[in-house]
UniProtKB/Swiss-Prot annotation:
Involved in jasmonate (JA) signaling. Required for jasmonate signaling in plant defense responses. Component of SCF(COI1) E3 ubiquitin ligase complexes, which may mediate the ubiquitination and subsequent proteasomal degradation of target proteins, including TIFY/JAZ family. The gene is COI2. This is Coronatine-insensitive protein homolog 2. GO terms for biological process: defense response; SCF-dependent proteasomal ubiquitin-dependent protein catabolic process. It comes from Oryza sativa subsp. japonica (Rice). Pfam families: F-box_5, Transp_inhibit. Jasmonate binds at residues 87, 352, 414, 501. Residues 18-59 form the F-box domain. Expressed in roots, shoots, leaf sheaths and leaf blades. Keywords: Jasmonic acid signaling pathway, Plant defense, Ubl conjugation pathway. It comes from the Eukaryota.
Length: 589
C-alpha cells in the first residue's frame, strides 16, 4: 500500500509540481513531434499544457483527422503542414480524381485557428474559391504560405494573395499546376504591395514571368533572399541580379535562347550577386557553365539536374566548388564525377543523383554510369553526409558495407537500382544491407528499390532486425516469399509509413505484417498477389484503420494492370469523397 501511495504522490508532483509557465517554456524547446507526443502522455495536465503550447503540427494524411478535432486538440497553433494525396501521386500512380480537396480544411482554418501564421499545403487540390475564403480571413496574419505540388487554382487568386497578404514573408508554389488567367500581374501586385517578402518560389511551374516585374520585385522587396522562378532567358535577368544585393538562393532562368541567334549570346562577365550561396540553373550547357567558375568557391548548394552538362563538365565544375553542402545531379555525372565530388566536397551533407530521362528532349547527351565505384568513393570521401539518394546501374555488398562504415551520420538513404544492364555484379545484397543498417544508426528514412532477386527473405529479416529508428521505408522488388515480409514485420519498432512496390506478397501476409508493425500508421502497396474480392485483407481490420483498394486503370494510372492498397489510421472515420476508381474495403471501426 505504501508503494502505491508513493506512486500517487509522485504522479501528483509530476502533474502539478511544475508551474504551467515553466512547463510551457521547457516544452517550447522540444521540437521533435515524437518527443512532444511522449510528453503529452505523461498525464492529463501535461497533455493540456502541450496542447496550449504546441506551435506547429504536421498532418501527414489529411483524411486521418478532421479540422475541428485538430483545433480542439491544438487551439493555439501558429503553423500547420497538411498533406493529402499519397506520395505515389508524384509518379502518376494515383488517379487524378482520388481526392485531396483542401476545401473542408480551409473553411475550418478560416473560421478558427486564430493564431495561424504559416500554412503549408502539399499534394492538395486548392480552388480559387478556397484561396478567396482563406485570404479574407487570414490575410492580416499570414507570414508564410506554401502551395507545394498543388493544383486547381489560378493566377487570379495569386494576385489576390499578393494584393492582400502584406505581411507575407514566404510564398512557395514550386511544382504546382497553376492556370494562367492574368498572366504575371500577380508578380506586379506582389512587388507593389509587399515590402517584407524574403522568399518567392514558383520553380518548376509553367508560369510566365516578366523580367521587368521580377526586377521591380527585387527592387521593392529589399529583404528578398530566395528567388526561384520558371523559365526566363538569363540575359534578360542581368538587371535583376545587379539589383538583388542580398540574394542567397536562386533557381530557374534559362540558357535556352528560344530562337535568338548565336551572336546575341554574351555571357562573358555575367554578374551574380556576391551574396549568392545556392544555385539551380535551367538548360545550361558546356559553353555557359563558365559563368559559374568565379562564384564556385562561395556556393553551398548546386543543382545541375536540369542542365546539358556532360560527365567531364561535371568534373570541371565540381572541382571549383569545394564548399558545397548540397549537390543535386543526374547520373550523367558517372563514377568519375562522383570521385571528383569525394575528393573536393568534404563538407557535403546532402547528395541526390537522379536518373536521367532518356526521352527528355536532348537533356541526355551522355549516359552516366553510377556504380559501386562511385558510391564507395563518396562514402569514404564525404564523411558528413546526412541525406543520400542515388540511382545506380550496378551495386555490390562491399559498396553498401562501405556506406555503413563511413557514412554513420546518414539519417535518410535511398537507393534505386536501374535496369540498364542485363545483370548486376553481385546478388543478393543481403549482407550489404545488414552492414549498412548496422552502421547507420541514425537512419530515419530508408528506400531500397532494386530488382527481383537482389534482396532475399534473409535480407528482409535483416531490415526488420536492424531498423530500430527507421520511421519511413520504401521497398521495391524485394523478397522471395511471404516469409520475408513476416520476418521484417517482427522488427522495425519505429516504422510509421511503409510503401511496397512490385514485391508480390500475398494479401494474408500483408495483413499479418500490418498487425505486427505496432507503430505503423500508413501503408501503400502496388504489385501484390491479389485475391478476387480482397477477403484476406480483412485480417488487417482494426479500429480507426481505413483500407482502400485503388483499381487499376489501363489507360492512365497503372498500365501494368496492378491494383493498389492504401491503408491508414484515421480518427475521422471513412471518408465520403471516394471516386469510382477507389473502393473502400472496410469502414473504420
Amino acid at each position: 500500500m505504501g508503494g502505491e501511495a508513493g506512486e500517487r504522490r509522485l504522479g501528483r508532483a509530476m502533474s502539478f509540481g511544475i508551474p504551467d509557465v515553466a512547463l510551457g517554456l521547457v516544452m517550447g524547446f522540444v521540437e521533435d513531434p515524437w518527443d512532444r507526443d511522449a510528453i503529452s502522455l505523461v498525464c492529463r495536465h501535461w497533455c493540456r499544457v502541450d496542447a496550449l503550447s504546441r506551435k506547429h503540427v504536421t498532418v501527414a494524411m489529411a483524411y486521418s483527422t478532421t479540422p475541428d478535432r485538430l483545433f480542439r486538440r491544438f487551439p493555439c497553433l501558429e503553423s500547420l503542414k497538411l498533406k493529402a494525396k499519397p506520395r505515389a501521386a508524384m509518379f502518376n500512380l494515383i488517379p487524378e480524381d482520388w481526392g485531396g480537396s483542401a476545401s473542408p480544411w480551409i473553411r475550418q482554418l478560416s473560421a478558427s485557428f486564430h493564431f495561424l501564421k504559416a500554412l503549408h499545403l502539399r499534394r492538395m487540390i486548392v480552388s480559387d474559391d478556397d484561396l478567396d475564403v482563406l485570404v479574407r480571413a487570414k490575410a492580416h496574419m499570414l507570414s508564410s504560405f506554401k502551395l507545394d505540388r498543388c493544383s486547381g487554382f489560378s493566377t487570379s487568386s495569386l494576385a489576390l494573395v499578393a494584393r492582400t497578404c502584406k505581411k507575407l514573408e514566404t510564398l512557395f508554389l514550386e511544382d504546382s499546376i497553376i492556370a494562367e488567367k492574368e498572366n504575371d500581374e500577380w508578380i506586379r501586385e506582389l512587388a507593389t504591395n509587399n515590402s517584407v517578402l524574403e522568399t518567392l518560389n514558383f520553380f518548376l511551374t509553367d508560369l510566365r514571368a516578366s523580367p521587368a516585374y521580377l526586377t521591380l520585385l527585387v527592387r521593392n522587396c529589399r529583404r528578398l533572399k530566395v528567388l526561384k522562378i520558371s523559365e526566363c532567358f538569363m540575359l534578360d535577368l542581368v538587371d535583376l541580379f545587379r539589383t538583388a544585393e542580398i540574394l542567397q538562393d536562386f533557381a530557374g532562368g534559362s540558357f535556352d535562347d528560344q530562337g535568338q541567334v548565336e551572336e546575341s549570346r554574351n555571357y562573358e562577365n555575367y554578374y551574380f550577386p556576391p551574396s549568392l550561396l545556392r544555385l539551380s540553373l535551367l538548360y545550361m550547357g558546356t559553353k555557359e557553365m563558365q559563368v559559374l567558375f568565379p562564384y564556385g568557391a562561395a556556393l553551398k548548394k548546386l543543382d545541375l539536374q536540369f542542365t546539358f552538362l556532360s560527365t567531364e563538365d561535371h568534373c570541371q565544375l565540381v572541382q571549383r566548388c569545394p564548399n558545397l553542402e548540397i549537390l543535386e545531379v543526374r547520373d550523367v555525372i558517372g563514377d568519375r564525377g562522383l570521385e571528383v565530388v569525394a575528393q573536393t566536397c568534404k563538407k557535403l551533407q546532402r547528395l541526390r543523383v537522379e536518373r536521367g530521362d532518356d526521352d527528355q528532349g536532348g537533356l541526355e547527351d551522355e549516359h552516366g554510369m553510377v556504380t559501386q565505384v562511385g558510391l564507395m568513393a563518396v562514402a569514404q570521401g564525404c564523411p558528413h553526409l546526412e541525406y543520400w539518394a542515388v540511382h545506380v546501374t550496378d551495386i555490390t555488398n562491399a559498396a553498401l558495407e562501405a556506406i555503413g562504415t563511413y557514412s554513420s551520420s546518414l539519417n535518410d538513404f535511398r537507393l534505386v537500382l536501374l535496369d540498364r544492364e542485363a545483370n548486376i555484379t553481385e546478388s543478393p545484397l543481403d549482407n550489404g544491407v545488414r552492414a549498412l543498417l548496422r552502421g547507420c544508426t541514425k537512419l530515419r528514412r530508408f528506400a531500397f528499390y532494386v530488382r527481383p532477386g537482389a534482396l532475399s527473405d534473409v535480407g528482409l529479416g535483416y531490415i526488420g532486425e536492424f531498423s530500430k529508428t527507421i520511421r519511413y521505408m520504401l521497398l521495391g522488388n524485394v523478397g522471395e516469399s511471404d516469409q520475408g515480409l513476416l520476418q521484417l514485420s517482427t522488427g522495425c519498432p519505429s516504422l510509421q509509413k511503409l510503401e511496397l512496390r512490385g514485391c508480390f506478397f500475398s494479401e494474408r501476409a500483408l495483413a499479418v505484417a500490418v498487425l505486427q508493425l505496432k507503430s505503423l500508421r500508413y501503408l501503400w502497396v502496388q504489385g501484390y498477389k491479389a485475391s478476387p474480392n480482397g477477403t484476406d485483407l480483412m485480417a488487417m481490420v482494426r479500429p480507426f484503420w481505413n483500407i482502400e483498394i485503388i483499381a487499376p486503370n489501363q489507360d492512365e494510372v497503372c498500365p501494368d494492370g496492378q491494383a493498389q492498397i492504401l491503408a491508414y489510421y484515421s480518427l475521422a472515420g471513412m471518408r465520403s469523397d471516394y471516386p469510382h476508381s477507389v473502393i473502400p474495403l472496410y469502414p473504420s471501426v
